[in-house]
Every structure is written in structure tokens, then in C-alpha cells.
Amino acid sequence: MVKQKTIQSEITLKGVGLHTGKEVTMTFKPAPINNGFTFIRVDLEGQPIIEADANYVVNTQRGTNLEKLGVMIQTPEHVLAALVGCDLDNIIIELDASELPIMDGSSKHFVEAIEKVGLIDQDAEREVYVVKEVISYLDEATGSEITVIPSDEYSVTTMVDFGTKVLGTQNASMKSISEFKSEIASCRTFSFLHELEMLLEHGLIKGGDLNNAIVYVDKELSNETMEKLRVAFGKDEISITPNGVLDNLTLHYPNEAARHKLLDVVGDLALIGTKIKGKIIANKPGHFVNTQFAKKIAKIIKNEQRNNVPVYDLNKEPLMDIHKIMSMLPHRPPFLLVDRILSMTDTQVVGLKNVTMNEDFFIGHFPGAPVMPGVLIVEAMAQTGGILILSTVPDPENYLTYFMKIDNVKFKHKVLPGDTLIFKLELLSPIRRGICHMQGYAFANGKLVAEAELMAQIVKNQ
């Protein structure tokens, strides 16, 4: 069993954003189990949290950009690649600006900072999505395609063809994530001269200089363009090296461009939110196709999880019987809707309700055609989740649980007298200040019958 990992202590780095040119202070902090990678904008009121989630991707024009409730996180891919490459699971990233620091255009400085403080194992098993079949995403407009196939470990191969004399076809491979730090982390971002001119004209590369981005000269460099570049980068002289790169940068590898594309793939696929066991093959990758592929994989994982019916021996003694449940929950019949707690961890609880014809709600819902009301299925899920949140306080009998929000409720099948409902509630984020954000599933007869995203808070009974 592989344990989840976080860092042993805080790390702070300072730099500028590549596109905004704004100075930014970034602090990595240890995070609790199942936190994943989360960003906190400490410069904004309320210090909003943005999870590293592919569903928050809004723009991939010159990097990956996330947005949640109007709050932006710009170009996180190099940092995310470093976190994955260092084998981390849980990190909080505090920022006082929207864009992460570009540093030298690679993941090198982030990896070095993480290695300086070291990692620590956490008391929870790492979740890994094992690829069982070929999954692909094709961008028909560009011909870019990413495929994952079954493999014993996470590996990545990138194939790029830029169609220019100075930078043509290149390939790069990472056979194991253990190779990231030595073979991939130091590979810097790059651009072509014609792209650089466009970016400068539109003010999209304010934090760039010739030390944090490789510039390949794919066109004749006029005196006018040379002067613009001198002014933009504050250089007295700019030259072209024999290998077609601006200024005096030395390439770390002949295929550094392909290796950096691989770095971007690793960073963008971190937005899946789960470690992958499979071989990634990326043909002409870019941030758009990378993040679309991440969304596809994340959706597949979610669908598999929601259809994964918990299996329990109902003859076995439960973790909590009805008497133990009543000692924690304030609810009483006929509104006590969970009969047993079958299992519970720090982040998940599984409960059970036997649905019988004796339920009061069947009198009117519906005469002659009894169906359990959907709202009561959601209530039963919430009561099961309430056990999880109440287990975090020493005196649960002195607390009440209140709904704050219910989202994305779906009812799949009817629940009838004689059915046995099994509820699975999983934390979507760590419990903070008595607030619990959960994903709930209800199963009956081996099928998913309902699901909902729930947010609740426990309040001490006055």
C-alpha cells in the first residue's frame, strides 16, 4: 500500500508571472489527506480556494488558466508538474497574485525547493486510477491527439513536429515518474520568433526575458525587430546562436522542446486529480488537448466511482447500530433515516437503511404505488454524512447539523418497499470550521439510484 505524501514544512518562492509581469509570492504548505492540490488567493477577500481541477479550465491560449467563481489561477502547469514529479499528493499553494511565478521557464526551482524541505508519508492510502483500456482524445482541428494505454506504471511519450527548419520533429520519453526530476524538470518553455512578436504586440509576455524562455528564430530577423526585442528585454545586444536560438542560452538537451512539452503534459494531467497508472502517448500536445484529455479521464473516473456499488456482508456486526447512531444524531423516528453505519474513515462513511412498507411516507406517496420520496433519499444521505462530520467532535450529542447547499442532485431509479439502501458519502474537501462538503451516492439492488453534492455545517446546540 502506497501512502499519500505531503511536504514536511512550508516553502516560499518569489518571482514574476510570465504573462502579467506581476511580482508574486508563492508558498507551498503541507495539506491534510485527500486534499489534493489546491490554490488559495491570499490577496483576495475571503482567501478563496481553487482546486486543481480540469473542470475549472477556461483558457489555454498561452498556458493553462483556471477560474472558479470569478477567481483566476494562471499558468499553474509548471508547478503542478513539479508536484507530480516529486511524488506528492497533497499541497496547499498560497498566492498573492493570479499568475504563478515563471522562474526560469521550467519546473527546476520548484523541484529543488520541495526537495530541500522533504516529504512525509500520511496516514491514508493513495488512490490510483488503473487504466484498463485504450482511451483517446483527438483535436480534429489541429490533429493533436493524446492516448493512454494500460501499463504497469505512469509513463509519458511526446511526439512533436513544428514544421520549421530550426525546430522540426522531436520526441521525448519518460519511462517512469522517477525520471522527472533528472530528465524533465529543467526543460524550459519556448516560443518561436513570430509568436514572440505577436505576444509582445498584445502585451501577453510582460514577465518574460531571454533567460526564462527559449526563443527559436524561425524567420529573418530585421533590424527593427531586433531593436524591439532589445527594448522589451532590456538588453544592449541580442544575438542568434548557431542552433537558431536567441541570445546566449545553452540548450540542456537537443530535444529540450519535446521534453518541455512532456513537462506540460504531466502538469496539465495533474488536473485529473488522481494518480494514473498507464502509458500516455501524446502526439503534438498542447494545453488545449492536454486539458480536454484530463477532463475526459476525470469524467470516466467519476462515472466509475459513482457506479462502484459498495459490497458488505449484512450479517456481519455493523460499525454502528441504531442505538449508537441515535447517540450521535439528534433525529428521531419517523425522521431517522439511517439504520446502520457499515464503515467509516476520515474521509468516507457508508451507511444503510432498510426501506419497509411501514414507513409513514408511503401512506401518501403514493396510495397503491408506494415510492420513497427523492428528497428523503437525499435527507438519508445527509444523515449518513452527518455521522462523519459529528465524529470529528468529542461531544457529538451537543451538536445539530444544518444543510447549507445541495447541488447536482440526480435520481436514477425508484426506491420501493423492501429495498435496502446503501449510502456512500465522500469528502470533496477537508472539514473546516465545522463545514463539510460531500459527494453522496445512494445504491439499491446493485444500482446507483441517486446522487447529490451536499454541504452541511454542525452547530453547537444552545
Would you name each region that the model predicts?
Residues 1-89, 94-312:
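C-terminal regulatory domains involved in ligand/effector binding and gene-expression control
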Residues 6-10, 319-325, 422-423:
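Short Pro/Gly-enriched beta-strand edge/turn motifs at strand-loop
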Residues 90, 279, 339-343, 408:
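Extracellular/lumenal ectodomain signal focusing on beta-strand-rich modules
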Residues 173-190, 372, 442-450, 454-462:
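Flexible glycine-rich active-site/ligand-binding loops centered on an Asp-His dyad
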Residues 259-272, 341, 347, 371-396:
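Active-site helix/loop of acyl-thioester processing domains in fatty-acid/polyketide metabolism
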Residues 273-282, 310-319, 385-422, 449, ...:
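Hydrophobic beta-strand-centered segment that forms part of the acyl-chain substrate-binding groove
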Residues 303-371, 398-400, 415-416, 428, ...:
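Non-catalytic linker/capping segments at the edges of enzyme domains
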Residues 337-340, 405, 410, 424-426, ...:
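Residues located in well-ordered beta-strands
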